[in-house]
């Protein structure tokens, strides 16, 4: 695309997505999650957005985890999070949990966004991650961009930093 200066630039683009709310209160500062096990070091590594804001989770017991309670309606919800393994954690299993619904996968060597969609029953229950599961004391994993939203698919990441009720991105 020729510009005024005659230099071709990359193709302009827009992200067209519906309005969504990230219901997680602390999507990057995971150490602030209300229910957790393990040691959490915020701003430990470079995240997928290119800044120093990924959290390192270190196993101090069998299964490190973090959870937040969410008030659900009887509709579809999608959880998503970016995960990157360190050392011996690569290839171990982790679980994304929405209430009693569990998605299991393996911890990758490179940053990967994992997504899990499920229809929930109405009520208040937890959303969380157990990583790795099972763990050995000292296992380390990087996490970033923890998101839970109403909808049958994940949209682009919506950062939150302690806002009660989450953050809404307009359409």
Residue ranges, per PLM feature:
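Extracellular and organelle-lumenal recognition/adhesion modules and their flexible linkers in secreted
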Residues: 1-171
């Amino acid at each position: 695309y020729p510009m005024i200066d005659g230099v071709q630039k990359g193709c302009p683009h827009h992200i067209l997505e519906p309005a969504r709310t990230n219901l997680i209160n602390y999507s990057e500062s995971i150490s602030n999650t209300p229910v957790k096990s393990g040691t959490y070091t915020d701003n430990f590594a470079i995240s997928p957005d290119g800044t120093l804001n990924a959290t390192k989770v270190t196993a101090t017991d069998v299964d490190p985890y973090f959870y937040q309670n969410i008030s659900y309606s009887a509709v579809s919800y999608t959880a998503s999070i970016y995960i990157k393994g360190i050392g011996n954690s690569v290839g171990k299993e982790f679980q994304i949990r929405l209430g009693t619904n569990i998605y299991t996968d393996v911890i990758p060597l490179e940053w990967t966004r994992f997504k899990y969609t499920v229809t929930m029953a109405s009520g208040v229950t937890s959303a969380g991650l157990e990583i790795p599961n099972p763990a050995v004391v000292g296992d380390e994993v990087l996490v970033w961009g923890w998101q839970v939203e109403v909808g049958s698919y994940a949209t682009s990441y919506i950062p939150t930093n302690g806002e009660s009720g989450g953050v809404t991105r307009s359409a």
